[in-house]
Amino acid sequence: MRYLTAGESHGPRLTAIIEGVPAGLPLTADYINAELKRRQGGYGRGARMKIESDQVEITSGVRHGLTMGGPITLNVTNLDHQKWQEIMSAADVDEKKKGLRKITKPRPGHADLVGGMKYRFDDLRNSLERSSARETTMRVAVGAVAKRLLEEIGVEVASHIVTFGGIDINVPNNLTVGEIKERAAQSEVSIVNPDREEEIKAYIDQIKKDGDTIGGVIETVVGGVPVGLGSYVQWDKKLDAKIAQGVVSINAFKGVEFGVGFEAGRLKGSQVMDEILWSEEDGFTRRTNNLGGFEGGMTNGQPIVVRGVMKPIPTLYKPLMSVDIETHEPYKATVERSDPTALPAAGVVMESVVATVLATEVLEKFSSDNLEELKDAVARHREFVKNF
């Protein structure tokens, strides 16, 4: 399975094309729209979420609610484009109109300046439009298709926030993936500890009042993963490496860890390695899950536990200093719409990206022209592993 996304933040629409999805997978626009709605939620979201109400249109690859095995095309209209038709016109316009909403003052922390240098733009809006987090709309749409596929083979994906700015959420131990999903869904800030809800919301309110932004750490957990996805035979076949690349590709993500993660650098080997157990009922299992579900770049049957760190949103209502690319004079950076935090939405994006990487790996390992063929292959593999 592979996919491409296209579209600009203020363009007419966003598009994704997905190739390699098995025939016979039940898929509806309503299912995808429910995931898109999750991305637009969360405490602290700003004006654009009131403007946009994302609705997907499926224009190929699905007939009568079932995938057909061909490329699936997904489109989401940008309702905000109505105000930007001349500014974002694909056709040539006169010089006066070209100058409308021109950006020459790059914002620190964004792709504006480096994009202008790389692609030789004199209007940094060209960098802003494609590098915008608006693109993650289609990552979530693609991820919805991936999650729909994973559901069919008993794989469940959930995400929640474990650190909000400088505040660590005290996460209860031994929550199942289903419990994490349920608790996070009930929280406006996507946390699984309701005792911290009001504290976090008050913190976000204060950050907004200060004209600042915060980042944090998001954890995605995946249960029911078949053993042996990924491989140790080449560096680029290791599944944890593929997931790491996917997570860090999300706007504003700066780091990733699995299981105990960077804490492993402070612990002894005897405290980190997961002891192997066996029972007639369950086959091989692990006593702990410090390695986050991976050994040798392969899934080991334990839940996948991956965390990504998101930097604060770089657009500030108290803008930092920058330099105009035309005059080279210092200036306060251009202010675009911004939120004090996008952590809950970013959690949905991360969850979607991880699901997409996993679905791609599942389809690479197992026969999958048709959904029933895939389900049969996965079931036979699970039985073999259990009896190993």
Swiss-Prot record:
- A single MF term (Gene Ontology): FMN binding
* Residues reported to bind FMN: R130, S131, S132, N251, A252, G296, K311, P312, I313, P314, T315, R337
Top-rank taxon, per record: Bacteria
Q: Which GO terms describe its cellular component?
A: cytosol
Q: Which reaction does it catalyse?
A: 5-O-(1-carboxyvinyl)-3-phosphoshikimate = chorismate + phosphate
Residues that, per the record, bind NADP(+):
R39, R45
SUPFAM superfamilies, per database record? Chorismate synthase, AroC
Keywords of the record, alphabetical order, are: Amino-acid biosynthesis, Aromatic amino acid biosynthesis, FAD, Flavoprotein, FMN, Lyase, NADP
Q: List the coiled-coil residues.
A: none
Does Flavoprotein appear among the keywords? yes
Cofactors that this protein relies on: FMNH2
Give the enzyme's EC designation. 4.2.3.5
The record, for Pfam families, names:
Chorismate_synt (PF01264)
UniProt pathway annotation: Metabolic intermediate biosynthesis; chorismate biosynthesis; chorismate from D-erythrose 4-phosphate and phosphoenolpyruvate: step 7/7
Q: How does it assemble?
A: Homotetramer.
What is the name attached to this protein's record? Chorismate synthase
- Organism of origin is Streptococcus sanguinis (strain SK36)
